[in-house]
């Protein structure tokens, strides 16, 4: 074999080894790549809460008739969607509460649902007046939550003074302690309670006006 032929043979072997290494690396990258979150909603940066709190109890009351309107306002099979800026905080809160579980009563709320709610209860003290921009639930930046099985003193959407986050009159000591535990866990994740409702927590920038998300719930 001439020197030229020998050089070509060596070059071919080296090329084959490099190609094999590239293929192997690609396989490893694929095998260990992070798994994409289920059902991400990238356009409006909303995510399914179960992708960040896998053991969440999702009990969307507005997907049933068990709510103050008495109507099913969300389609059957609706997801609990939150803005991605809340994801880390909710994961922290859930970790603080385990083995108890977070129950989600409401997350992202479409604008037309907010309009219907205000038609039924046109009192801004209890139902936010629909505006021309998305805030809070309408932007996916607020959640309504409780602790599974815990006595909290009232049910969801109880339009009485006992629903206030720091209420004492008519709220027993155990319920006050449970509300405090929920607040502490959520605050550890950077989420703040709305003083008018012990179950309502806001994420970063919840009060800032934003475009309405165009996101399907189911």
Feature map (PLM): residue ranges:
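Bacterial N-terminal signal peptides that target proteins for export
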Residues: 4-19
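Segments that shape or occlude catalytic/ligand-binding pockets
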Residues: 110
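Short, well-ordered surface patches within globular domains
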Residues: 113-114
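Extracytoplasmic cell-surface/polysaccharide-interacting catalytic and binding patches
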Residues: 2, 20, 26-107, 117-218
């Amino acid at each position: 074999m001439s020197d030229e032929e020998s050089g070509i043979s060596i070059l071919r072997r080296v090329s084959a080894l490099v190609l094999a290494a590239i293929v192997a690396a690609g396989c490893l990258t694929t095998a260990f790549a992070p798994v994409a979150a289920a059902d991400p909603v990238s356009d409006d940066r909303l995510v399914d809460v179960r992708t960040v709190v896998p053991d969440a109890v999702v009990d969307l009351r507005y997907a049933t008739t068990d709510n103050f309107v008495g109507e099913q306002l969300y389609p059957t099979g609706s997801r609990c969607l939150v803005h991605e800026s809340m994801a880390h905080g909710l994961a922290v809160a859930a970790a603080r509460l385990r083995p108890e579980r977070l129950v989600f009563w409401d997350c992202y709320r479409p604008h037309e649902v907010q309009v219907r709610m205000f038609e039924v209860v046109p009192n801004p003290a209890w139902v936010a007046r629909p505006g021309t921009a998305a805030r809070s639930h309408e932007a996916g930046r607020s959640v309504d939550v409780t602790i599974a099985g815990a006595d909290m003193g009232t049910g969801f959407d109880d339009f009485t003074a006992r629903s206030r986050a720091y209420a004492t009159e008519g709220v027993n000591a155990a319920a006050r302690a449970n509300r405090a535990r929920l607040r502490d866990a959520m605050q550890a994740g950077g989420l703040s309670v709305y003083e008018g409702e012990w179950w309502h927590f806001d994420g970063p920038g919840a009060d800032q006006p934003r475009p309405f998300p165009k996101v399907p719930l189911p």
